[in-house]
Amino acid sequence: MINITEAAQTHFAKLLANQEPGTQIRVFVINPGTPTAECGVSYCPPDAVEATDTELKFDQLSAYVDELSAPFLEEAEIDFVTDQLGSQLTLKAPNAKMRKVSDDSPLAERVEYVLQSQINPQLAGHGGRVSLMEITDDGFAILQFGGGCNGCSMVDVTLKEGIEKELLNMFPELKGVKDLTEHQRGEHSYY
């Protein structure tokens, strides 16, 4: 479910040494399965462990996850990275905003999952997003752009060179992608 690197375990172990004996960590998701989902890590004293929690045992500590957060923390990773600027804890949870879908899920669900978990995080850097409106009977994914992508002069490149290539590579049953957006250039547009 969650991978906690050795560096992160060592970091947590140092922090836990200053806490009440038996205290571990809790990994959670606030608003799981929504665009506003946020992940967090907190101390988990022994009296805060619930019967429905999942305990994940690691070499240096245990991490507790509540049952509501668990499916959204699949493939999550916690790391402690050090570079020239200092050290920081990173928590990557690709499924926090949307549950991972299985390979035999309907095509629309699988495409939507890729858009939300892989494409939109890249577009978010420009204040943009894309949504799947439908998959046509002839195999085209109809998309709608929003935020900084609406009216952006680079949207055609993003659509054809980025999104379409990635989706066609992952879903050979698709014939292509089309943009439904009525682009209105404005201050919100990235380029």
From Swiss-Prot:
Cofactor details (free text): Binds 1 [4Fe-4S] cluster per subunit. The cluster is presumably bound at the interface of two monomers.
Classification via Pfam families: Fe-S_biosyn, NifU
GO annotation terms (biological process): iron-sulfur cluster assembly; protein maturation
Intrachain disulfide bonds: none
Keywords: 4Fe-4S, Iron, Iron-sulfur, Metal-binding
Subunit relationships: Homodimer.
GO terms, molecular function: 4 iron, 4 sulfur cluster binding; iron ion binding
Annotated [4Fe-4S] cluster binding sites: C149, C152
Functional note: Involved in iron-sulfur cluster biogenesis. Binds a 4Fe-4S cluster, can transfer this cluster to apoproteins, and thereby intervenes in the maturation of Fe/S proteins. Could also act as a scaffold/chaperone for damaged Fe/S proteins.
Protein family membership: Belongs to the NfuA family.
Cofactor(s) annotated in UniProt: [4Fe-4S] cluster
Protein name as it appears in the record: Fe/S biogenesis protein NfuA
InterPro entries reported for this sequence: Fe/S_biogenesis_protein_NfuA, FeS_biogenesis, FSCA_dom_sf, HesB-like_dom_sf, NIF_FeS_clus_asmbl_NifU_C
Family annotation (NCBIfam families): PRK11190.1, YhgI_GntY
